[in-house]
Structure formats: C-alpha cells, structure tokens
C-alpha cells in the first residue's frame, strides 16, 4: 500500500498483463486497470468472457457499430462504452455469472418487490 494515512490506493494501470494473472481472473473493487493486447474483436471477447465473474465490462472505441457489437458479445450485467462511470439510479444494476443474479434499480429492479397475480376467467 502507498505511504500515508488511510487506505487510499492511487489509480493504477498495469500494461501487458498475462491473461492468467490473478488481477485478470478476479473482481477487483479498486482503481486498477489491467491491460492486455488482442488481435481481433473475437479474441478480445474470448479473453474478456473467460472469467467466472461478470459485473461490468468496458470498451473504448471511436466506432459506434463496433462498440455495440462488442457490448452485445460481453458476458456482463453492465457495459460502459467510452465511459468509466455508468451508474445511474434509473438504470438496472447487477451482474451475471458469479457476480450476481437479478437487478437493483430501474424498472427491472422494482420487479423483485412486486407480487404478480394471474387471473384466468372462463366465459
């Protein structure tokens, strides 16, 4: 940890991280960005999805069609496109795989608190 009071850890980018590294295999709830290279979008998706977790994923590109295709292929509950902070009270929040099931917030999140009743009537 850095010197100084408290538990502050400065934002850190780690380049050329091997895909089998622990930092690429676990959820890191801190300001750390492991960066690895890829040759094709398919390879990038394969690398990104090769984890048991899936809370949020990020993609950065100038090509909107490419960004949307990558977002569709990512196995995560949320995707940030060209944005690091995407939380919004009106949006559903939640992950997939070992990162959770269900959603909080947004219209989808309220469903957990509602009772649905079906009434069938013969006439």
Each predicted region: which residue ranges?
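Conserved C-terminal structural/oligomerization subdomain of aldehyde/semialdehyde dehydrogenase
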Residues: 4, 8-123
């Amino acid at each position: 940890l850095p010197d100084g009071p408290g538990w502050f850890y400065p934002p850190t980018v780690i380049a050329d991280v091997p895909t089998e590294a622990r930092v690429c295999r676990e959820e890191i709830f801190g300001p750390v960005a492991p960066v690895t290279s890829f040759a094709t979008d398919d390879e990038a998706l394969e690398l990104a999805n090769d984890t048991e977790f899936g809370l949020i994923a990020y993609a950065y590109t100038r090509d909107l069609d490419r960004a949307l295709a990558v977002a569709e292929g990512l196995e995560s509950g949320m995707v940030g496109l060209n944005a690091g902070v995407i939380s919004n009270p009106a949006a559903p929040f939640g992950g997939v795989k070992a990162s959770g099931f269900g959603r909080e917030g947004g219209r989808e999140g309220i469903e957990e608190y509602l009772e649905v009743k079906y009434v069938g009537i013969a006439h």
